[in-house]
Amino acid sequence: MARPSRQALLALLLTATLMNPLGDLYGQDPTLAADRWNRAALEWIQLLQNGSFEEAGSRVDPAVPAGALGAAELETLWAQLSAQLGALQSVSPGQVGASGPYHIVRVPASFEAQSLIIQITLTDDLTISGLYFVPAEPPPYDPPAYIDQDAFEEVEVTVGNEPWALPGVVSVPKLQGPVPGVVLVHGSGPNDRDETIGGSRPFRDLAWGLASQGIAVLRYDKRTRVHGPRVSATIGLEEEVIEDALLALALLRDRPEVNPAKIFLLGHSLGGILAPEIGRRDGGLAGVTVLAGSARPFFEVLTGQLEYIASLEEDPNSPARVQLDSLLVTVERMQAGEIPDDEAVLGAPAPYWREVAAVDPVATAAGLPIPVLVLQGGRDYQSTTEDLALWVKGLEGRPGFESKLYPNLNHLFGPGSGTATPE
């Protein structure tokens, strides 16, 4: 399960506080930035850098859930970020985009350890409605050896309609006759069509690999990525995942190159957890594949992730470990129903987490009259071999069920060795 964002989980490992003054970070006064959106974004970053968290918090849109971008949360986040990446060395005016009434500024920022994009969402009156830390442009894609780029072509498509239309692409094999088709459903967070995480693009690997073998694959940018600022703070799984996945399946089924009787769904992480429900709702799939889909009770999964990360912190008294322990207490309170609905935990309000906790993917899969394939990486500490065991226990002996463990693969199904970490 990956809903606690990579940024949030990595942040829990961080300890130090940014002390460097702003100095010449901008190379110019922020008031000289190209437009009012950049000026507002750069001025806000300057407040964070100067330690003026109360003032920074006062510029946050009142519609943002309590506990998300308040002064205390901003202070903790900025301290965590600097401890992970070192001192902030420079920022510059960034690209400005619009999504409905919101304006998104992608500010390039250089830290000692690496560069990233500080993505700030602004309202028309220049209040802050969103803050994300996005990896800088990944390195050029190096296709795996199993991909034959001459075996398929890519066709741009649009999933759904306004106001939530999503750009996507179908990898179409260059074969005669209708071919099988697969829709890929992302994990949590504002993922792009490739499910890009650092230098990894697991969904492009899958799409191009399957297309090389004669299978059409549809992948698309997630709603929370394309329309993030317009998505309600009370968004649920229906709006975040299920509705768009069903629309994508319908789109692929209607394409002339694809055999409508051989449409499959492949979900990763949160997408894997919801894959059986999406399959049940669609009613016409030929099969479902689950990659790294947790089967344990959600709060057990979340607590397990946090405890694992805490175990990587050698000093039990370090600020990072103290923050982890505090978050574990918060999770316990959330499980007990003691967190108000408007309070954000790990970037989402408590009702969201309760909705995730109510999902029982194994029970739903057991009721599907179609094949189910479950794949799991042995180095994955988010979805683990315990989850795979529960899938097997619930579905073993059922016609069409298969499972496979890949001992050396992580949550993204990339190879590795040694202790797995969030990095």
Regions found by a protein language model. Name each.
Residues 32, 39, 54-102:
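Short solvent-exposed beta->alpha transition segments
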Residues 138-177:
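N-terminal cap/lid segment of alpha/beta-hydrolase-fold proteins
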Residues 175-209:
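Short, surface-exposed "cap/lid" segments of acyl-processing enzymes
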Residues 205-227:
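Conserved alpha/beta-hydrolase
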Residues 235-256:
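Alpha/beta-hydrolase active-site loop
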Residues 287-367:
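Accessory cap/linker subdomain of secreted extracellular hydrolases
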Residues 368, 374-376:
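Short beta-strand/loop motif that positions the catalytic acidic residue
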Residues 381-387:
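Conserved alpha/beta-hydrolase "acid-adjacent" motif
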